[in-house]
Amino acid sequence: MVAAKGNGAHGTETYTMGIHTSKHNLEVAKRENAVVLMEDNYQKNYQGFDPKLPESHILLSLYQSAYNDNSIKLAQNIQHQFKSRVGRKSRGVKQAGLLVLWKTTAPSVLVEVGFITHPQEEKYLNSKLGQMYIASGIFRAFRDYKNELEANS
């Protein structure tokens, strides 16, 4: 879930590892990655990564892996399920240098399922039905992604 300024933002978005394609994506990456500073021994755990330094974001962009195309395909499947089957507004697939996607050894995505600053969306996200639909959409997207991979190999 995402907290955004104001209460007009709503919908889902899915991130894959990538270079910052917009100023907004760079700001999201900086904000999301800043939480590592709260951890004990973050410099050791993250090999000197400092979300405040531009060099760290350049380093993240260099770690775009061979799994990038597969990550994008999985992210597209998730957004398709959210829009067509779950009835959510899709804010699209985006790329950003998010630490949670760094150095993965498999396709990886970060799914933002909604904005808690939007009152109706917060209510939906807190409901059992909303949680079931969101989880079901992610499951179907992964199942379809897996079936596509197996059919092409």
Predicted regions, residues:
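Active-site-proximal helix/loop segments of hydrolytic enzymes
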Residues: 1-153
